[in-house]
């Protein structure tokens, strides 16, 4: 009789544990503290290839960290909300994800410039870091005006400067750029227009004629724009597309008017395998830049494949995408989150404990991703080494140029900085100072 009662109690207890384990419980989960992270994904819509890869990697890395003891014993929890790469839905997701079971978010990553602009003014008030990994509002790189906004480890003005530097090298030098014609073909959104302040200034200084051509979202109808390009006969086209459909459509249209693909340079968010495959042979020769290089041979990627996917916990529907551009970029973003959290724990004497938004901000600003540290993590060579400071929230500002060979990307350059980094930094500071003045913000003293 007693044995039957004990068995029933054990059975009930087992069922209760199973039920409780499906919920994210704040601060302690059976004795372990937790840290809550939001996943503002974009798995639906034109940017689905990007979103599934990027956010899939973030979840994969958090699973990997948990499988290896958490962050100094603190286990990671998360909740996902679908933005569909839409600014209004991004705000809705921010509000929905803001707090879970009594724990507030410490970081937010929209992977969308329109979405970043939609929430950026809430960061300081809410004590949340806006992590713009290579996207978003560029003058957020001035930490004196935007202490809660980071562009680590690169932004669009550095990216366009690196592209123009590469074009000049192909042409034989900056002096050979005078009289050249460049079309900036872009989606008609804040994202598509973001590089223009720096691009206009550099082109003006070099004597380059810049032609700006916009494409209405979602960007699948481009015939009139490419007819204009055929009439203009530019020397180069910089393409700022959003979504694999728009990105591949541009290459097929370029082929239709016989515009050489090796005179096209794609933005980071059009520079992935999923953007190239749909265009077939029309994509061959296209240049692109990367702030995270593809490859499945990096030690951390191998460990995630072995431990997370080996245990059947991988987030990607197709494990073959491990090591792809978008997945590796999401991995780089998640690594920065966790490194920021580690720093915060050490800086605030909270090793083994969850951190607050203000503490996380301090830790994120203390990021120092040296080659040695990248090697310890297992991603040396995948991203450029960088460090963040109180005033400089960009870091590296470096990109690698790649070229599509029909099956994969060939790396053409190493990690390249703008030809004049001080010039780009000056533009950032000038823009941030203007914003501060217009909004009565007193810049932080660093």
Where do the language-model regions lie?
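Venus flytrap/periplasmic-binding-protein-like
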Residues: 83, 130-132, 136-141, 218, ...
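Periplasmic-binding protein-like
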Residues: 97-112, 129-134, 181-186, 233-244, ...
């Amino acid at each position: 009789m007693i044995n039957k009662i004990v068995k029933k109690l054990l059975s009930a207890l087992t069922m209760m544990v199973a039920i409780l384990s499906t919920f994210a419980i704040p601060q302690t989960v059976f004795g372990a503290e937790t840290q809550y992270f939001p996943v503002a994904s974009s798995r639906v819509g034109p940017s689905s290839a990007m979103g599934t890869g990027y956010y899939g990697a973030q979840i994969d890395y958090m699973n990997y960290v948990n499988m290896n003891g958490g962050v100094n014993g603190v286990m990671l929890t998360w909740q996902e909300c679908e933005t569909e790469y839409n600014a209004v839905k991004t705000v809705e997701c921010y509000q929905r994800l803001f707090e879970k079971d009594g724990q507030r978010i410490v970081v937010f990553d929209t992977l969308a410039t329109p979405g970043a602009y939609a929430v950026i003014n809430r960061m300081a008030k809410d004590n949340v870091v806006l992590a713009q990994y290579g996207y978003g509002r560029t003058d957020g790189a001035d930490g004196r005006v935007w202490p809660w906004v980071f562009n680590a480890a690169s932004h669009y003005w550095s990216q366009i400067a690196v592209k123009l530097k590469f074009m000049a090298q192909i042409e034989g030098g900056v002096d050979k750029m005078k009289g050249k014609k460049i079309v900036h073909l872009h989606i008609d959104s804040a994202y598509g227009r973001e590089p223009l302040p720096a691009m206009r200034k550099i082109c003006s200084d070099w004597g380059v004629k810049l032609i700006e051509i916009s494409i209405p979202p979602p960007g699948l109808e481009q015939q009139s724009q490419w007819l204009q390009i055929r009439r203009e006969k530019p020397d180069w086209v910089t393409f700022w597309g959003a979504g694999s459909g728009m990105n591949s459509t541009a290459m097929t249209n370029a082929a239709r008017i016989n515009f050489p693909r090796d005179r096209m340079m794609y933005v980071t968010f059009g520079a992935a395998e999923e953007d190239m495959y749909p265009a077939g042979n029309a994509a061959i020769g296209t240049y692109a830049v990367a702030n995270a290089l593809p490859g499945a041979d990096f030690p951390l990627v191998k460990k995630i494949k072995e431990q997370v996917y080996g245990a059947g916990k991988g987030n990607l529907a197709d494990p073959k995408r491990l090591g792809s551009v978008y997945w590796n970029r999401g991995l780089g973003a998640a690594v920065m989150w966790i490194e920021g959290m580690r720093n915060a724990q050490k800086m605030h004497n909270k090793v083994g404990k969850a951190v607050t938004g203000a503490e996380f901000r301090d830790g994120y600003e203390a990021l120092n991703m040296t080659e040695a540290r990248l090697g310890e993590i297992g991603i040396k060579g995948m991203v450029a080494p960088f460090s963040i400071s109180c005033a400089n929230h960009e870091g590296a500002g470096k990109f690698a140029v790649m070229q599509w060979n029909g099956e994969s990307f060939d790396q053409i350059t190493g990690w390249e900085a703008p030809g004049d980094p001080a010039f780009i930094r000056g533009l950032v500071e000038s823009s941030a100072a203007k914003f501060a003045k217009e909004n009565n913000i007193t810049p932080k003293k660093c």
